[in-house]
Each structure stands twice: as structure tokens, then as C-alpha cells.
């Protein structure tokens, strides 16, 4: 490794651990040598904290970090700010604000939120306004608590009979709508850049909208998708044709990039394949290197 190389720190995302008890997240992360681990609140997943974690649950979670020597500053919250019903939207905002407070109590510095999952073309002016207002309210709370929001680049998903998924452009994967978001959102609000999620709706853009988002990325997930049957199936970076080398070489974000391997049946193998791929990039690149 030369002195000129950009050293990128790699952590591990929580979604591939969603069916495992929380302690096993830490055990697996420790096994690989990760120092950074994402966690989630709500969503009715075995591998997440409850919808409204009490102090005992929070203390138990924080104790795991201390026990395993792993930092957990990244928290995922399940939300949709594009709901058509105004009352349901208001309830969603209240839920998210409560969970942001729980994330802060857990020691998080960043919360990963979603804009919403309806097709971008179905977002009316009214829905757009409510969505922006929701992020403004959540950002104000985050500023008080010392947290930052990273909005995930994530399309709408339809599940096919063959087990694959069809991805539909949302406001966070469509370039024109992303440009509007960059203009309308509070300036503190950033993006969880997930190139794989952008690839599946914009397969011809080999840099996955990096040119548009580069200055606002404050969170990053690493995965790929492969065509299968009627749609796509998630995989490890390096499993398919998404070339991460030029993305890493041009990425301005200097925080933790998290491997997010989604399949449940071979979680550890998928993480290892991802690390092996990063090793190949490091060998090929004069610009980037990786560390855990």
C-alpha cells in the first residue's frame, strides 16, 4: 500500500442478520474482525431492537458493544414518508421521532431512514411537501440530539412468484427526483449511498448516480444484485457486474462503508466473498485500500 492510497474503513450492515438474535450479530462481526456494526430498531425482525425499546433493552444492547469491543453508531429505522393518508403519515412521523430518540439513547450518531416506496411518478405535490416536512422535523430533532440522517437510495420493490424482486424507481433512485431532494431537503440531511439499489433501476449508469450524490453521502452500503428469472436477487459485491473500483476511487465520503449482504442462507459466506472482492480491488487500484 502506497502513502497516496485512500484508506476506506469497512463495517457490516444489519439486514443480513435480521433473523438472528442480536448477540449473534456481534459474534459474527467479531469473528471477521469488524469494529463497526449497524443495528436496527423496529420492523418486527428477530434481529432488531423492539419498536419502542425501554431502558433495560437499550442497556443490554450497549453492553454487547462493550463486551465485544464493537462500535454501533449506525441505526436503521423502518419508515415511509410517502404515505397517501395524512393521518397515517403523521403517525409515521411521530413513530420515527420516538425511534430517533431511542437510537440516540443507544449511542447512534447516524440514523438510516427511507423517503418512501411508491413509484416516483405517483408522488403528488401534496405527498412531496409532507415528505420534505417530515425530514425537516426529524432533522431538527436529530440536530438537538447530535445525530445525522442518511436517506437510503432504495426503490420500490415487488416480490415475484419465483423469489426474485422487481425494483421500481422511487424518489431516491430517480435522478430528477434526487436533484429535487438535494434542493428541498435541509442541508444537514445526507444520503445512504447504496450503489446496488441504484443499479437495479438504472443499470446503464455504471457510477450509480455518484456524480449527483457525492457531496451529500454520509452513510454507505455495499451490495450487488443479479438478474434472476422475472427480476433480481441480492448478492455480495463482486458476485455480479457492478464494478465498485471506480466508485470507491471517486467517492468523497470518508466514513464507514458497510457490507450489506442480504440473503439469510449463507450470511457469513457472503460477507467473506465481499471482503475477498475488496481485496481484489485493493490489488488492482493505485488509489484505494481497505481496513476493518
Spell out what each predicted region is.
Residues 48-55, 85-89, 123-124, 268-269:
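Metal-dependent catalytic neighborhoods of phosphoester/phosphodiester hydrolases
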Residues 24, 63-68, 82-193, 200-203, ...:
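Active-site acidic/histidine proton-transfer and metal-coordination neighborhood
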Residues 2-13, 72-83, 117-118:
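N-terminal small/glycine-rich loop or linker at the start of catalytic domains
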Residues 38, 74-76, 112, 150, ...:
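Conserved beta-strand positions in the central sheet of alpha/beta enzyme cores
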Residues 47-52, 88-89, 167-168, 233-238:
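Short glycine-enriched, charge-decorated loop/helix-capping segments at active-site entrances
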Residues 1-11, 18-35, 59, 66, ...:
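Histidine-acidic metal/acid-base catalytic patches
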Residues 40-62, 118-122:
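Glycine-rich, proline-tolerant flexible connector loops at the mouths of alpha/beta enzymes
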Residues 16-18, 41-43, 78-81, 115-119, ...:
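Active-site-proximal loop/turn and secondary-structure-junction residues that shape catalytic pockets
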